[in-house]
Regions:
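Conserved ATP-binding/catalytic motifs of P-loop helicase motor domains
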Residues: 1-254
Length: 254
């Protein structure tokens, strides 16, 4: 977080109390926060250790596993780009595999095919998302899903489960660390689907962004907008995205 954001929140919360900005700065300095060079960003040492553990798990897990299902033939209904993404994920030899797709690229359709490929290899699949509405959307797309919070609460997974997390960019550092440790404890694998450019973590830290930035992993990516009719969008946000995309393409072509 930026130090000025922390100070703003403290001043609002402490309204009516006898302290000023100078006193607040002094307290922040005494807390021993770690500062990022050349920026206003600060973090706690505990959070830094958490992010470091996340990145190390992702980095050290590169190339350490067998491919999930390298011989699985993607469905003919997939676009060439979607088929490439499915093959890349199913051929992954990493403990953590990254998948990124913007709204309208057919991400859910692709994830459903990835799930089919993993299950065809005899591996259990656990699909998770941070919020209940996201879980409902995944279920509507034909996937059996649960909330991340419930999974972390019960602390139980099938052995060798492949855990697929949608909207992983919304997961905070502590939850990501807990999830990674849970998957490791059950000898599983982790697929993180999300776009840090669209959504950020609600809780402190951003686990997916740390992995993308420092682990050296390369994501399977969908870029082509498949749902180009705004009327077919599933939400107002997606409708606005598709409408804006079409306007941008039209402007670039004129």
């Amino acid at each position: 977080v930026n130090d000025y954001e922390l100070m703003t929140a403290a001043l609002v919360h402490g309204r009516g109390h006898d302290f000023d900005l100078a006193a607040l700065r002094e307290v922040i300095e005494k807390r021993g926060y770690v500062r990022e060079a050349g920026t206003y960003k600060i973090t706690s040492r505990d959070m830094l250790r958490c992010e470091y553990g996340i990145v190390v798990s992702a980095r050290d897990g590169r190339g350490m596993e067998l491919p999930l299902n390298p011989d699985f033939p993607p469905a003919s209904a997939l676009s060439p780009e979607q088929a490439v993404a499915v093959k890349k994920i199913l051929n992954s030899r990493d403990f953590i595999t990254l998948f990124r797709g913007s709204a309208g690229t057919g991400k859910s359709f692709t994830l459903r095919e990835v799930t089919a490929g993993i299950q065809a290899a005899g591996l259990p699949v656990v699909v998770l998302a941070p919020q209940r509405q996201q879980v409902a959307d995944l279920c509507a797309d034909g996937l059996t899903a649960d909330t991340l919070a419930h999974c972390l609460l019960i602390k139980s997974l099938p052995r060798r489960a492949v855990v697929l997390v949608d909207e992983a960019g919304q997961i905070g550092g502590k939850q990501m660390d807990m999830l990674i440790n849970l998957v490791k404890a059950h000898n599983g694998r982790l697929i993180l689907s999300g776009d840090t450019r669209q959504h950020g973590a609600v809780q402190a830290s951003d686990g997916l962004r740390a992995i993308e930035k420092f682990s050296g992993l390369r994501a399977a990516v969908l870029r082509d907008i498949r749902r180009q009719n705004p009327a077919l969008a599933r939400s107002a946000k997606e409708r606005a995205f598709v409408t804006g995309y079409r306007k941008a393409v039209k402007a670039a072509s004129s």
